[in-house]
Amino acid sequence: MGKKMDDLISIVLPVYNGEKYLRESIDSVIAQTYQTWELLILDDCSTDRSTEIAKEYEARDNRIHYYRNEQNLRLPRNLNKGFSLARGDYLTWTSDDNRYKPQAIEKMHAALVSANAQFVFASCRIIDGDGKEVEYIMVNEACKKKIIGMNPVGACFLYTRKAFEAVGEYDPELTLVEDFDYWQRLYTQFGAATLEEILYEYRWHDGALTSTMRQNTFNQTLEKVLLKNRAAFGKIDAEGTYYYYRGLYNCRKKLNDENNPYKKKYRLYSFWYFVRYRVPRKIARMMHEK
């Protein structure tokens, strides 16, 4: 049976003053082994050469479409605009400073089709501003358990139009964690497939979460998301509860809250997790090494 390569994949690329790495990002889409795609570049009022670069690519490839907002929408609304224009059977988005590996779209699409799944995510390599490897975000089946309290998805993912229509738009009130909120909403409705292979390069550089105010906003909003989506997970076991309270505890810890309301439950479930999982795994490794 041959590979199914005719489903249209819509890739939304939000841009804001991304001239430095934009060509690398677009080139990584063009280099995909899966060629049935459309790239929608959503320019959120850039003041650098992003417009010029995007229009250059649009003129060269009729699969690339450039749109410029009349006013700055910020990321969640910009994504929503992009997906409202998308025509694909499968949807994803990337960033103006990140890069796909050549087989990323093909392998994620194949994973969804073969597993009859609605949402898939894959491992990423983290690179610095010069493109040098820093570390990895590794994905496996076990990591899905973490999604109730922390983000295992990374930046390499694909989901179906069916899932998009069921889950709806990205929440414009959740800037900085709009993606994690969306992954939780997708996961609670459809579950997820995973790919351990590294299919994406995610760039850490000076534009990341640097200011204290931005970090505080991130952790405050993340706590809000964890509390908001908890009920959708239904009944969870003790391991899931550990990850949930670990996420909440870390939010308050990073906000320097001396009266962290999640401390007791986090410590309780941390102890349980250590005894139930960490100790047996360590013993198993020691026995294997003998």
What positions do the PLM features span?
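A conserved acidic beta->alpha catalytic loop
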Residues: Q35, D43-E52, Q71, S95
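C-terminal subregions of glycosyltransferases and related glycan-biosynthesis enzymes
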Residues: G2-K4, D181, T188, R203-K290
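N-proximal low-complexity "stem/linker" segments adjacent to membrane-targeting elements
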Residues: M1-I30
